[in-house]
Swiss-Prot record:
Residue ranges of every copy of the Sm domain listed in the record: 7-79
PROSITE patterns: SM
Protein name per the record: U6 snRNA-associated Sm-like protein LSm6
Pfam families documented for this protein: LSM
InterPro entries per UniProt: Lsm6/sSmF (IPR016487), LSM_dom_sf (IPR010920), Sm (IPR047575), Sm_dom_euk/arc (IPR001163)
Main location: cytoplasm
Sequence similarity: Belongs to the snRNP Sm proteins family. SmF/LSm6 subfamily.
Length: 80
């Protein structure tokens, strides 16, 4: 049985519509539902919250984040 290796592109396709954390180069975190992204890592989030130093600073309905500012994207566990 051979296991297929998952590429970063595969991972990103799988998490569309799920809660994510987007960490920027500046250290700011955006948490929300991943609406879409492109090959340049430009990201559209829904139900977005902005965290600075771990503290909630703002809430946005929709947010667009330019890809060159993104340090990483990770999945976020759903809140109960």
């Amino acid at each position: 049985m051979s296991l297929r290796k998952q590429t970063p592109s595969d991972f990103l396709k799988q998490i569309i519509g799920r809660p994510v954390v987007v960490k920027l180069n500046s250290g700011v975190d955006y948490r929300g539902v991943l609406a879409c992204l492109d090959g340049y890592m430009n990201i559209a989030l829904e139900q977005t919250e902005e965290y600075v130093n771990g503290q909630l600073k703002n809430k946005y309905g929709d947010a667009f984040i330019r890809g060159n500012n993104v340090l990483y994207i990770s999945t976020q566990k759903r809140r109960m």
